[in-house]
């Protein structure tokens, strides 16, 4: 077995042996890290191995929690009690200072437990209030930092496996303090030349500490100096702690090189490796011999047993008890100063750093000293060694000099600490047993009384024992090992310490396979062993220093009387420099201002981006105005002179808007930046105009109060500008003959006195409510009351008068329309240019309650322009033209003349040129019933009983009689409708169908008894309760957006789960990392948001996969996922992500601050790949974290990119500079690159971004490749047409293989405007057409420039038009309509879009005699207000003109009724019915499509379809719009499908 192990070891260490024919290394070279010393237990004594325990660990929880207060005394109190005493007492054994520091050197070779552990755990030492050293101000909150040491990670998990500390050096006496504890460390010390250790400029000194050699570089507590400069490279990490330890390191450094030189002379053919290894083994052997056989007996006054050979089963591991025993006993002998002398026994003065001279080197001011002025040369070091050899150490007792007790080097935070208190904490950290347990375990006699600890001390100074006993509450069993062992020491270490140390060295010697006396390891011959045994430290000093041996005593560890060079006197603190006081440092000192500036700069990123965006928007707007100027000839041609720039104040909660004020004869005109007229103020006598001028804040405000209108408040830049306008106004008003009154108010009072537009609107709303309450007998509570304590402005509601502009606005018409002029002139009886309450009421009573004769007479008077009692044919044409103006000039003059001639001819007035009122009334004879029963259907208003009676009477009319208007039936109760709605009832003619006379005029044949559709709108009672409206609004919101809510809930649940998972991990499960102990809130916030941000910024890419979304919309997934809301979801994700990004940044700001004030020992645990704890303590500054780390720098750049992208992507700037948005949004590529780099540095955790990013990135990349494969084909524009209202019609080639469906959209880029800027537009062409067409409205710079570019070119039109890039189609079509013989298309709001192409397609196919299965289409559009479908008028008109076979029937439902007393809707309702009867066209659109007011009655409508199309067994119903509407359609289809008749197949899409 032994042979096999030896063979394996030989193979293992073969790499250490140089190759060659002649190999002078004939032995097994010892490893530097201590491994494989014992061939059975390879790890014994290796670097990083656990310490051995002689006694079981003593922890509070039995595992790792140390004991402490209140069970044990305060360490500082205990230190002051035990170790305080006088200095200058000589060693009773005459031990020298050299022996003391040689003991420290031996300890550094054997053990190191000072290195802080990870995660960082602190056992800070609380300082008692009023401590003269550390708390002289009696603050009571002072603590000395103490960090627990490293432990074996395999321990500390259970009471059976308590925490064991780890030794950071080898546990062998193998010269690791000289050569290092690893091969790499040794290589860093070597010169690789002639076997020597590397030296600096002076061959007597090693080179300075530098990377990769990582020496402990603690700051100098006396001067604060730090850094590696002045620290030498030794094998011991802390070899530079004191000049005295440093001198011993230099001694062995020089001794090795001395031996290497000697061997090189003896063996000139040896290589560097042979020389180094021979010198190394000789130096180690000498070191072992001196430590064990010379120093240890002088230290213990005991000798080790005779060496009997290597004992492989003996564990040589260092014990925790040995660490405390050896170091603490040595600390009692450290003097306050150290002498220096030369070989001739001259004790020289020491030059201090302040240039003063003292008799000795003060210990407390020498810790971690760099480049001390008295230690600049090898001779200085020699003098220090000689001085330590002649100086008697302090007495071996329990007293520590103040240099050790109060001025021991601490961390940079506290430059000083208490050595004994720190050792006590270290013992508790190591789990050392109590004093009594240790004695019992080591076989020593038990101690039962405090006096028995040290009888000599009890006799000489019993107060120390008594005070110590008091601290432990007289309980000897709680006395700790360290103070107990210290108290029992007298002359020599006490029995406990002596036993521990002796036992440890026996195990070290006998268990070391490489011990120099082991003749079986092949290291030395017996002769060489004898030479080594005869070598003493005196021999080493003589050889290195090159002095006469008589200058030193034979045993340099003890000085006896008669030895050479006695010390002048025993040193005490007297006559020595005072110790530098403790300094408390703030790591963040001097960084506050810069840190604040940095954070402020980061916060300014959005502001800088806003400024940039504003500049770009201004430049783009300037170009936009220049382009628009060419299309404003009608406005520019007006002579607007005297214009002045100002800001119009619109109200307290409204933003100010820039305006231009122009003074013209008889009026003041206010326009905006685009020269669009915002307001015209008429100046007519005898008006009285009031000026109110501000008297403070720069006197820049002007209030112009105009009677019967809202006020105009203008803000100017300078008082001079305001004054100039006032002067011009005075002149203009005097010329107009108007009186002026001026006064001044403070600006705040002026704005409170102003009547704003919003206040005027509320005033008019009350006006209209009470107006209709008078006409329709509406409940006063519904109309709105006027309390007595209401403001003056509200009480004036009934006395206010409407201007012409307000009257026109209330009708939704233009002030210059002829209809408005006619009605206003008729109503304005006093001719003052305003309508009073009474004037409006008089004309409204006629419209709402008058007889047919009164209503026709009113219309007659309106259009009797010359007032001669006759309406000429021209006036009749003007009357119709007034309606045509309202309907956007939908009929030409020829068509209008034809209609008038036809109406005159049918009434028998073809020979008349003028009509009397009787003739005019005769022409309207067919509408008597409609005029009679014209009532205003107001939600919440009961229908008059007379109407109900008429309904009841109408139900008994036979089939061959004409029943009243179904509008009357619509007002009956639901039960009445259900009982009276019979097939016979459905045969009554409807007011929604043109009257028989009108149909005959246009050649339409009417069958008296054919089934008709029930299309009258269903109206509901309007609930005015705010609670009811809120509940209904919430219910509609949930109903309309249930898919959106579901998807958003799932998405945010995932994001929230990711946040909570990371937050929980770092709050509760990451204690082993230690980062939460440093920055809990910051790390939880930053890591939680980072997880959510990674998820959001990854999956936001899917919302831009247009091709994928287009495909998925046509699958069943569209019923669950609102793919149409992808862009809105994109914005929502982006908004949430930027909020989380800000929170993420805030979290890291907190982290950076805390990292900037955390010592290096903590940071090295948190970031082991970034920091190494070298004792320097000083953390990196804040700017290092921000700008010199990959995550920090990329994070700052990411914030800048996000600021730019988000600002330019805002709705405001996107409208003003789409190109800016387009270009900045392409920064997303750089954004994702930086995100990957940002997270891949693994500063805190392993990269996780790729987990979220990979799948969306692949999908997005594939989607982009699909787009790139087609959008780079140049498309020629066939036709470009400039239409009114800034609309550009483009018709261009259809690419080969381009298939699309109705309602889909494309993205185009104009090559003349840039090949990378794409804009989305809906296709307005039908799928059957050979070309594609778009209708583009000039609403921004790009579309305006597009309109300019496609203006009429010269030469060949097709060749001259700039070409396009095309990408698409996107979206989903609605194409199953052709599978049904009868189809019903129901569009709600914008949901009508997909049906426009369907209508065109159907009409086209029917017009070319194409075989089409679908024979009839009913198109129903439900919209809130008539203004929402003005853009569709041209398409529907085209359908009507081409629909020669009457395939399409269009019905439009306006859901906004007069329940809100909206005059516009009410009057247009009346005018619509009148216009429909007269001209068979809608007043709003000029179409033959029927316009209804209310909601469509789907169930009666579908029932009537079964009567109209009895032969059709299956009808397709297609609905697009809000979910509430499609749900009602679905419900109606389900109810009808319960009958065994026609089946209604419903297909719906929600918008």
UniProtKB/Swiss-Prot annotation:
Gene Ontology molecular functions: calcium ion binding; heme binding; NAD(P)H oxidase H2O2-forming activity; NADH oxidase H202-forming activity; NADP binding; NADPH oxidase H202-forming activity; peroxidase activity; superoxide-generating NAD(P)H oxidase activity
Region spans: Peroxidase-like: 26-593
Cytoplasmic-facing ranges: 618-1044, 1102-1148, 1210-1226, 1270-1551
Pathway annotation from the record: Hormone biosynthesis; thyroid hormone biosynthesis
Catalytically driven reaction(s): NADH + O2 + H(+) = H2O2 + NAD(+); NADPH + O2 + H(+) = H2O2 + NADP(+)
CDD domains in UniProt: dual_peroxidase_like, EFh, NOX_Duox_like_FAD_NADP
Segments forming domain EF-hand: 815-850, 851-886, 895-930
Glycosylation site positions: 94, 342, 354, 461, 534
Enzyme class: oxidoreductase
SUPFAM superfamilies: EF-hand, Ferredoxin reductase-like, C-terminal NADP-linked domain, Heme-dependent peroxidases, Riboflavin synthase domain-like
Topology Extracellular: residue spans: 22-596, 1066-1080, 1172-1188, 1248
Tissue expression profile of the protein: Expressed in thyrocytes and tracheal surface epithelial cells (at protein level). Expressed in thyroid, trachea, bronchium, and to a lower extent, in placenta, testis, prostate, pancreas and heart.
Every Ferric oxidoreductase domain range: 1087-1269
Positions of transmembrane segments: 597-617, 1045-1065, 1081-1101, 1149-1171, 1189-1209, 1227-1247, 1249-1269
Binding residues annotated for Ca(2+) 1, in chain numbering: 828, 830, 832, 834, 839
Flavoprotein as UniProt keyword: yes
Main location: membrane
Region (Interaction with TXNDC11): 956-1248
Subcellular location: Apical cell membrane
Documented activity regulation: The NADPH oxidase activity is calcium-dependent. Peroxidase activity is inhibited by aminobenzohydrazide.
One GO term describing the cellular component: cell leading edge
Family the UniProt entry places it in: In the N-terminal section; belongs to the peroxidase family.
Subunit structure: Interacts with TXNDC11, TPO and CYBA.
Protein name as annotated: Dual oxidase 1
Organism placement in taxonomy: Eukaryota, Metazoa, Chordata, Craniata, Vertebrata
């Amino acid at each position: 077995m032994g042979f096999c192990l030896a063979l394996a070891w030989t193979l293992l260490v073969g790499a250490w042996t140089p190759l060659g024919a002649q190999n002078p290394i004939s032995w097994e070279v010892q490893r530097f890290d201590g491994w494989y010393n014992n061939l059975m237990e390879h790890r014994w004594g290796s670097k990083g191995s656990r310490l051995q325990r002689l006694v079981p660990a003593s922890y509070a929880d039995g595992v790792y929690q140390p004991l402490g207060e209140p069970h044990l005394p305060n360490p500082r109190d205990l230190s002051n009690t035990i170790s305080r005493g006088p200095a200058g007492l000589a060693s009773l054994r005459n031990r020298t200072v050299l022996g003391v520091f040689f003991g420290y050197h031996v300890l550094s070779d054997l053990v190191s437990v000072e290195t802080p552990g990870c995660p960082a755990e602190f056992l800070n030492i609380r300082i008692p209030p009023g401590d003269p050293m550390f708390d002289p101000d009696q603050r009571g909150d002072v603590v000395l930092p103490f960090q627990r040491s490293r432990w074996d990670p395999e321990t500390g998990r259970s009471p059976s496996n308590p925490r064991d500390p780890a030794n950071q050096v080898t546990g062998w006496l193998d010269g690791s303090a000289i050569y290092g504890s690893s091969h790499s460390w040794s290589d860093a010390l070597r010169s690789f030349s002639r076997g020597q250790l590397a030296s600096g400029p002076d061959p007597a000194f090693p080179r300075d500490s530098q990377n990769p050699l990582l020496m402990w570089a603690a700051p100098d507590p006396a001067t604060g100096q730090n850094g590696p400069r002045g620290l030498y490279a030794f094998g011991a990490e802390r070899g530079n702690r004191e000049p005295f330890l440093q001198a011993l390191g230099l001694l062995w450094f020089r001794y090795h090189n001395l031996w290497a030189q000697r061997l090189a002379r003896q063996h000139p053919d040896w290589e560097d490796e042979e020389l180094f290894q021979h010198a190394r083994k000789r130096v180690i052997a000498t070191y072992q011999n001196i430590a064990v056989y010379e120093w240890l007996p002088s230290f213990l006054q005991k000798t080790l047993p005779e060496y009997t050979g290597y004992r492989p089963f003996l564990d040589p591991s260092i014990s925790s008890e040995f660490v405390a025993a050896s170091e603490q006993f040595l600390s009692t002998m450290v003097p306050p100063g150290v002498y220096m002398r030369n070989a001739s026994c001259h004790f020289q003065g020491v030059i201090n750093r302040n240039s003063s001279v003292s008799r000795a080197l003060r210990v407390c001011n020498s810790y971690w000293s760099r480049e001390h002025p008295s230690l600049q040369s090898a001779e200085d070091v020699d003098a220090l060694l000689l001085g330590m050899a002649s100086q008697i150490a302090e007495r071996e007792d329990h007293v520590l000099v103040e240099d050790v007790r109060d001025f021991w080097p601490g961390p940079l935070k506290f430059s000083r600490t208490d050595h004994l208190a720190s050792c006590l904490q270290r013992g508790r950290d190591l789990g050392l047993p109590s004093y009594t347990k240790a004695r019992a375990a080591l076989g020593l006699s038990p101690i039962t009384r405090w006096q028995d600890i040290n009888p000599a001390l009890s006799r000489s100074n019993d107060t120390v024992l008594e005070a110590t006993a008091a601290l432990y509450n007289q309980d000897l069993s709680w006395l700790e090992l360290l103070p107990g062992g210290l108290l029992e020491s007298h002359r020599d270490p006490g029995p406990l310490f002596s036993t521990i140390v002796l036992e440890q060295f026996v195990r070290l010697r006998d268990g070391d396979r490489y011990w120099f006396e082991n003749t079986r390891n092949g290291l030395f011959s017996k002769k060489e062993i004898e030479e080594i045994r005869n070598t003493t430290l005196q021999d080493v000093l003589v050889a290195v220093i090159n002095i006469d041996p008589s200058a030193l005593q034979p045993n340099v560890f003890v000085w006896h009387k008669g030895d050479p060079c006695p010390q002048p006197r025993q040193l005490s603190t007297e006559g020595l420099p005072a110790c530098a006081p403790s300094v408390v440092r703030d790591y963040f000192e001097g960084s506050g201002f810069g840190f604040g500036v940095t954070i402020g700069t980061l916060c300014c990123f959005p502001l800088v981006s806003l400024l940039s965006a504003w500049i770009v928007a201004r430049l783009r707007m300037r170009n936009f105005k220049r382009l628009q100027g060419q299309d404003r000839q009608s406005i520019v041609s007006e002579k607007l002179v005297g214009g002045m720039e100002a800001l119009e104040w619109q109200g307290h909660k409204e933003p100010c808007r820039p305006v231009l004020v122009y003074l013209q004869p008889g009026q003041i005109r206010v326009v905006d930046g685009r020269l669009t007229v915002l307001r015209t103020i008429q100046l007519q006598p005898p008006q009285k105009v009031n000026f109110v001028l501000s008297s403070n804040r720069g006197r820049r405000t002007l209030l112009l109060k105009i009677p019967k209108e809202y006020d105009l408040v203008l803000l100017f830049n300078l008082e001079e500008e305001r004054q100039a306008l006032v002067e011009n106004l005075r002149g203009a008003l005097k010329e107009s003959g108007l009186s002026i009154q001026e006064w001044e108010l403070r600006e705040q009072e002026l704005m409170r006195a102003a009547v704003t537009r919003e206040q005027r609107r509320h005033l008019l709303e009350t006006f209209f409510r009470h107006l209709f309450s008078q006409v329709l007998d509406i409940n006063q509570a519904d109309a709105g009351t006027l309390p007595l304590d209401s403001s003056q402005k509200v009480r004036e509601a009934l006395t206010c008068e409407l201007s012409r502009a307000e009257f026109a606005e209330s009708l939704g018409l233009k002030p210059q329309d002829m209809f408005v002029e006619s009605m206003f002139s008729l109503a304005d009886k006093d001719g003052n240019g305003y309508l009073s309450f009474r004037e409006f009421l008089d004309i409204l009573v006629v419209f709402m309650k008058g007889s047919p004769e009164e209503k026709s007479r009113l219309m007659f008077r309106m259009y009797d322009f010359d007032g001669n009692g006759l309406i000429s044919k021209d006036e009749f044409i003007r009357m119709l033209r007034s309606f045509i103006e309202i309907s956007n000039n939908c009929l030409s003059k020829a068509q209008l003349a034809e209609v008038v001639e036809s109406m005159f001819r049918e009434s028998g007035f073809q020979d008349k040129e003028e009509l009397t009122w009787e003739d005019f009334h005769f022409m309207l004879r067919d509408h008597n019933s409609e005029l009679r029963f014209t009532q205003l259907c107001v939600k919440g208003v009961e229908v008059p009983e007379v109407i109900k009676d008429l309904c009841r009477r109408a139900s008994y009319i036979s089939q061959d009689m004409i029943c009243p208007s179904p509008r009357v039936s619509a007002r009956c109760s639901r039960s009445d409708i259900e009982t009276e709605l019979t097939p016979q009832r459905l045969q009554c003619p409807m007011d929604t169908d043109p009257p028989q006379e009108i149909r005959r005029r246009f050649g339409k044949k009417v069958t008296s008894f054919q089934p008709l559709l029930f299309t009258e709108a269903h109206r509901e009672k309007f609930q005015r309760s705010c609670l009811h409206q809120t509940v209904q609004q919430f219910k509609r919101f949930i109903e309309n957006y249930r898919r959106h809510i579901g998807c958003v809930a799932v998405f945010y649940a995932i994001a929230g789960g990711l946040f909570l998972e990371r937050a929980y991990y770092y709050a509760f499960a990451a204690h082993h990392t230690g980062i939460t102990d440093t920055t809990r809130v910051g790390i939880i916030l930053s890591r939680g948001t980072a997880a959510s941000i990674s998820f959001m910024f990854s999956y936001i890419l899917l919302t831009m996969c247009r091709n994928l979304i287009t495909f998925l919309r046509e699958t069943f997934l569209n019923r669950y996922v609102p793919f149409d809301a992808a862009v809105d979801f994109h914005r929502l994700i982006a908004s949430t992500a930027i909020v989380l990004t800000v929170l993420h940044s805030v979290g890291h700001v907190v982290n950076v601050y805390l990292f900037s004030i955390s010592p290096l020992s903590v940071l090295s645990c948190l970031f082991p790949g970034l920091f190494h704890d070298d004792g320097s303590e000083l953390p990196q500054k804040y700017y290092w974290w921000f700008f010199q780390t990959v995550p920090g720098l990329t994070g700052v750049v990411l914030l800048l990119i996000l600021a730019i992208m988000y600002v330019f992507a805002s709705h405001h700037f996107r409208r003003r500079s789409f190109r800016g948005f387009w270009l900045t949004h392409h920064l997303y590529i750089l954004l994702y690159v930086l995100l990957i780099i940002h997270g891949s540095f693994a500063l805190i955790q392993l990269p996780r971004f790729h987990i979220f990013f990979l799948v969306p990135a692949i999908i997005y990349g594939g989607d982009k490749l699909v787009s790139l494969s087609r959008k780079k084909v140049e498309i020629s524009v066939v036709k470009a047409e400039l239409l009114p209202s800034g609309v550009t019609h483009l018709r261009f080639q259809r690419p080969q293989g381009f298939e699309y469906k109705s309602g889909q959209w494309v993205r185009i880029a104009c090559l003349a405007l840039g090949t990378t800027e794409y804009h989305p537009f809906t296709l307005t062409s039908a799928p059957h057409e050979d070309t594609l067409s778009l209708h583009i409205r000039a609403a921004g710079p790009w579309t305006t420039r597009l309109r300019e570019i496609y203006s009429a070119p010269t030469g060949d039109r097709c060749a001259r038009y700039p070409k396009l890039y095309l990408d698409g189609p996107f979206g989903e079509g609605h194409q199953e309509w052709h599978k049904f013989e009868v189809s019903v298309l129901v569009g709600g709001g914008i949901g009508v879009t997909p049906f426009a192409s369907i209508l065109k397609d159907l009409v086209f196919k029917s017009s070319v005699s194409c075989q089409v299965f679908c024979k009839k289409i009913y198109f129903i559009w439900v919209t809130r207000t008539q203004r929402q479908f003005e853009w569709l008028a041209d398409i529907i008109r085209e359908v009507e003109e081409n629909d020669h076979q009457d395939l399409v029937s269009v019905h439009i439902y306006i859901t906004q009724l007069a329940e809100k007393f909206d005059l516009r809707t009410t009057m247009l309702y009346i005018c619509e019915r009148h216009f429909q009867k007269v001209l068979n066209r809608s007043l709003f659109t000029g179409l033959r499509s029927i316009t209804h007011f209310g909601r469509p009655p789907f169930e009666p409508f579908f029932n009537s379809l079964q009567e109209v199309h009895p032969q059709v067994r299956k009808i397709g119903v297609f609905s697009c719009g809000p979910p509430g509407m499609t749900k009602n359609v679905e419900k109606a289809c389900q109810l009808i499908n319960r009958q065994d008749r026609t089946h209604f197949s419903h297909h719906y899409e929600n918008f």
